[in-house]
Amino acid sequence: MLEQEENGLFEIPDYEHVEDETFPPFPPPASPERDPADAEPEEGSGSGVPVPPKRTVKRNLPKLDATRLTSERGLPALRHVFDKTKFKGKGHEAEDLKTLIRHMEHWAHRLFPKLQFEDFIDRVENLGNKKEVQTCLKRIRLDLPIVHEDFVNNNDEVGEANGPDVSATGFDPFLTSSSDSRKFASEPTRSLTEEQQQRIERNKQLALERRQAKLLSNSQSLENDVTVEENSTGEDQEESNGLNIDTADGPHDVPFASTHEEEQCKAEETQLDHTNLD
């Protein structure tokens, strides 16, 4: 503590022969908390290492191209945009046009909100010549599936059409029993041994041989029956031909015999008449 003098003043020490204290330099204003060891080397010093430039990562901005136009929110979504809208019809053409344009603007904004509606129409008109867009339009006109949801819905409809009726199978015990019997019948076939399989094949071959022998015997008997029928038909034809010849000869002789008998009868009558007269 400085001693106070009698007149109330403090004694001032001599600072002329005292050396000043050294302090480190201040950091640059851009980085106030930076250490001096990490400070950038000066340009004049040749020992400085060149600092690589900073890389800027660019974001891929969305573009209105053919793939975006044919996506789920693109042209396929137009099929269902006007499902719930009702147009007034004749006499209200202006109002109907306004509603149509309003729905189209909403569709365009959902697909690509960065463009105005006029610019969007120009861009879509230019993309109309692309092959992808034309194929998408053809599939829409032919009512073919385009998006994944369309394929899923078609598969569900086909499965419902081909699948059994749940109401019928729920109350019909025979259907369930038949399916269970098929399962039980398929299980023992898997557990067959080689000897059993060979025995089954032998039985099949024996059955086939027996069947072929039976077919041969049946064919031979049929051939014999055919020959017998042909012989019998030949005999019948000969008999019928003989009868036809007899009938053809008979009618020519009959009139001669009848006329001869008539003449004899007349001669006898004349003789009787003469005897009566005598």
From Swiss-Prot:
Subunit structure: Interacts with MCM6 and MCM7. Interacts with TIMELESS (via N-terminus), which impairs TIMELESS self-association. Interacts with RPA2 and PRDX2.
Gene for this chain: Tipin
A GO BP entry: mitotic intra-S DNA damage checkpoint signaling
Modified residues (Phosphoserine): 191, 219
Organism: Mus musculus
Protein name, as recorded: TIMELESS-interacting protein
Phosphoprotein as UniProt keyword: yes
Signal peptide from the UniProt entry: none
Functional note: Plays an important role in the control of DNA replication and the maintenance of replication fork stability. Important for cell survival after DNA damage or replication stress. May be specifically required for the ATR-CHEK1 pathway in the replication checkpoint induced by hydroxyurea or ultraviolet light. Forms a complex with TIMELESS and this complex regulates DNA replication processes under both normal and stress conditions, stabilizes replication forks and influences both CHEK1 phosphorylation and the intra-S phase checkpoint in response to genotoxic stress.
